[in-house]
Amino acid sequence: MEEQKNKRGKVGLAAFLLADVLLIGAAAYMIVMRQQDIPAGVSLSSTAAATTETWMAETEAASTEPEESVPLELTDEIDSRFAYVWNVTEDRVLAEKNGQERMYPASMTKLMTLLLACESGIAMDTPYVFDKDMLDPLIAQGASRVGFEPEETVTFADLLYGSILSSGGDATAALAEVVDGDEASFAKHMNRRAQDLGMFDTHFVNASGLHDDEHYSTARDIALLLEKTLENATCREILSTSVYTTSRNSVHPNGMEIRSVVELRMQDYQPEQVKFQGGKTGFTDQAGYCLASFAEQGSDPKGA
């Protein structure tokens, strides 16, 4: 998964700040805008830098004329195959590119895993013991992991934070087991919840986003999912957290300090006008680099 792809190539994350527009490159990208006058965000790779001034002017016009404007259609000059830019406060799409076409969501899937786990009502201090039979398949598949070991006892909170900050497949597999008994049952739960949210072109097969041809979504559906996730106070706190230390146990006497992957990747790309709040990255060979994120502007921003 994405944590094993640390180098940034031409299709990796690249950022440009021109005037008031934040431009971020990824293979599939969605940013949720949370204030009326917030600058628009969009996928962009370094190869498109020469065209950004024209694009910027068009996007700013789209963001300041909600009554007359229609979503800006991003062209093939933007390397990202899928994009969806949404002003949540006004419930208005600012720009999109193939926003309703199917794509592989990779670890953005873990937003749904987080939401269902937080909605389960399970106590944060509920213990969970890892076993080798669960961890070995994840290692074989090359899934990103927090680093939990066989026979290690952790808490439900550790699993929640580990699933997002470290994008840990070990944490998400454990969450699926705790919430629904096994991952297959949890995937059915994920699909039912997706229908409830109006994610009608999404189908989940697993809790982590490991590639499967039948595991797909759209940029629009991921936007809906992120909005709903942010309405949950616990989910929002986790998605906005920079650093977390897991509980102490016999395997890790001092706990493990885990840091937000998405924040580490975004730390060099912070515009003055917009405050990046958090989100979820993703990567598989089939999906490419992915990002679902949210930002706010102003000291008293609108939105959830």
Predicted segments — roles?
Residues 1-11:
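N-terminal Lys/Arg-rich, disordered targeting/topogenic segments
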Residues 4, 48-50, 55-56:
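Phosphate-binding loop of NTP-binding sites
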Residues 9, 37-44, 55-220, 227-233:
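Active-site-adjacent loops and short helices of periplasmic peptidoglycan-processing enzymes
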Residues 9-11, 21, 35, 111, ...:
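Hydrophobic alpha-helical segments, especially transmembrane helices
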Residues 13, 41, 70-71, 76-80, ...:
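Penicillin-recognizing serine hydrolase domain
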Residues 15-27:
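Hydrophobic membrane-insertion alpha-helices, especially the h-region
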Residues 27-41:
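Hydrophobic single-pass membrane-insertion segments
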